C-alpha cells in the first residue's frame, strides 16, 4: 500500500503523485502495456445530483463499478429493476459514463456539464488538475486515461479514484486500485486527516511478471547483504556490528 495523509488538508497534487509512483514502479519492473484509469467521485455524485438522484448515488456507483464484469445491459437492468431508476435516468447514466476519447476530449465533454452543480464543478477541477500534474510528473500519455466508468465500490472514497489495468491481461482485472478519502479517519479521531492511497494486488502482479519473464535477479534481490543471528539475549554486540556494517554500505539485518 502507498498512502499520503494530511493534517487538516491535503493538496490535490498528492492525488497525482500516487499514480505517478505506480507508473515509476511498473516501468522499473519492465511493464509497458498498463493503463492507470482515473475518475473523480465528485464528478459522478454531481452528475447524479443533476438527475435528482443524490440519495441513490451510492447504489448507482456500486452498480456502475461492475460494468466491466457484467456489461452495460446488465448494469442498466439493475439500475431500473433494483435501484428503481426510470428508463430515462438509467440511459442518461450509461450515456455519461460512455464518454470516451483522449483525456483532453473527455475533459472537454465534462466541461459542458459545468455550472449546473457545485459538487460536479469541484470534481471537474480536481480531475483536470490531476491530469495536468500527471504530465508534469512525467507519466506517459498512453499510460493514464480519464475513465468515467471507474467508481470504486467503497463509499469512503470522496474524490479521485484509480484502477490500473494490464492491457494484455484483461481477465485478471485491476492490479492496482485506490483513491482519495477525506473523511475515513473520523471514525477513529476528531482530527481531520484527509488521505489518498493505492493498493497493489501482489498475487496478480507477480503472475504477470512471471508470465513475461520479468522476475529477474534485479527483482529477486535479497533484503540484506548480511544476516546477523545473535545467539544471546543481549543484542548489544549485534546492534553495534550491524551499525558498523551499514556505515560501510552493507545492508545488515538482525534476525
Model regions and ranges:
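Short acidic alpha-helix initiation/capping motifs at coil-to-helix transition points
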Residues: 36-39, 67-73, 122
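A generic structural motif
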Residues: 37, 60-62, 252-255
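Acidic, His- and aromatic-enriched active-site or binding-groove loops in soluble protein domains
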Residues: 52-80, 166-168
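Glycine-rich, mobile lid/loop segments that gate access to catalytic sites or pores
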Residues: 36, 40-47, 52
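Positively charged, Gly/Ser-enriched RNA/tRNA-binding surfaces
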Residues: 1-32, 42, 76-255
